[in-house]
């Protein structure tokens, strides 16, 4: 489901200016003049074409904030994780990617810009294994040439062969960025055994036995490696909504993207202050989030 192509036309046909109009009315209780201004910011900011070359690959298609921001946040969560927990950059780190839709392909692109190499991509119809690692240009080409939300390349091998090989490649980073509930315990075991250090959830509830929150596989992964939960890693679009609901929000690419990056960094900083160990990130983050919600609920 695409926000710009699918959701907004439906809500507009129902007389709403923006899908977040209920939040503006109910949560913020905005006055009429302020409400119109905030809804205008939401309409403009989400659909804004990204022009700053730092945030978009140059190509024939115009890309909006809504197309790029979630994948950007996923990549930034990994970059901030390495900086905060290990004092390292992404230079020379390796990654495998599950999916090649907006989130997965954008995350892969931003990871390469930060210095990482993509050594494997697995998509529904096949995948690519490149143990030397793909940098900015090859990944940009794959990003620009995807067919809808699907990987499209003459270098693709079958799904079966990719699935057999990719989990044991020894990538530092894994981005589950396809549908929910796909990642299995044997896949997690193979990644742990081959040295994977961090999983950043581009997909919501990516593990096969997840329910509303973490199932057994997610809990296990959280004890064995660094698992950045979906509500931090892929909060990009939700955070853009919150940013655009501020009065007089600056509607530049830099301001919007930087706000998402800093929000993710702050969340990981809070987790690290509470629990400095690089395991248990998801459990700790959920505990902190629930505490904040309880405070709000109780009126503190």
Regions found by a protein language model. Name each.
Residues 1-3, 62, 66-70, 99, ...:
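Catalytic cores of large soluble enzymes that bind and process phosphate-bearing ligands
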Residues 1-90:
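Glycine/serine-rich phosphate-binding loop and adjoining beta1-alpha1 elements at the start
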Residues 2-12, 107-110, 123, 130-136, ...:
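Short acidic, glycine/serine/threonine-rich loops at helix termini
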Residues 8, 13-23, 94, 119-120, ...:
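Structural motif
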Residues 103-107, 182-186, 208-210, 234-237:
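Short glycine/serine/threonine-rich phosphate/pyrophosphate-binding segments
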Residues 126-227:
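Rossmann-like adenosine-cofactor binding region
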Residues 192-300:
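Adenosine-phosphate binding glycine-rich loop
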């Amino acid at each position: 489901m695409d926000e710009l192509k699918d959701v907004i036309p439906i809500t507009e046909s129902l007389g709403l200016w923006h899908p977040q109009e209920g939040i503006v009315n109910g949560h913020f209780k905005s006055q009429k003049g302020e409400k119109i201004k905030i809804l205008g910011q939401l309409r403009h900011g989400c659909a804004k074409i990204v022009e700053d070359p730092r945030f978009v690959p140059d190509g024939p298609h115009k890309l909006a904030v809504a197309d790029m921001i979630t994948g950007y946040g996923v990549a930034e969560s990994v970059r901030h994780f390495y900086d905060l927990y290990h004092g390292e950059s992404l230079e020379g780190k390796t990654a495998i990617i599950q999916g090649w839709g907006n989130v997965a392909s954008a995350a892969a692109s931003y990871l390469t810009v930060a210095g990482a190499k993509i050594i494997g991509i697995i998509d529904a119809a096949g995948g690519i294994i490149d143990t030397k690692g793909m940098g900015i240009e090859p990944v940009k080409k794959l990003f620009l040439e995807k067919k809808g939300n699907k990987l499209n390349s003459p270098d693709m091998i079958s799904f079966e062969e990719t699935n057999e090989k990719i989990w044991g490649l020894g990538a530092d980073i894994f981005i589950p960025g396809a549908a929910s509930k796909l990642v299995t315990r044997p896949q997690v075991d193979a990644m742990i055994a081959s040295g994977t250090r961090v999983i950043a959830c581009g997909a919501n509830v990516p593990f096969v036995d997840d329910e509303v929150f973490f199932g057994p596989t997610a809990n296990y992964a959280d004890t064995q490696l660094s698992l950045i939960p979906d509500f931090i890693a892929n909060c990009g679009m939700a955070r853009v909504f919150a940013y655009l609901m501020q009065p007089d929000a600056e509607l530049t690419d830099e301001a919007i993207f930087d706000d998402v990056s800093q929000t993710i960094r702050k969340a990981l900083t809070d987790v690290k202050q509470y629990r400095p160990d690089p395991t248990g990130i998801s459990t700790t983050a959920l505990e902190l989030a629930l505490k904040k919600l309880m405070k709000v609920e109780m009126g503190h």
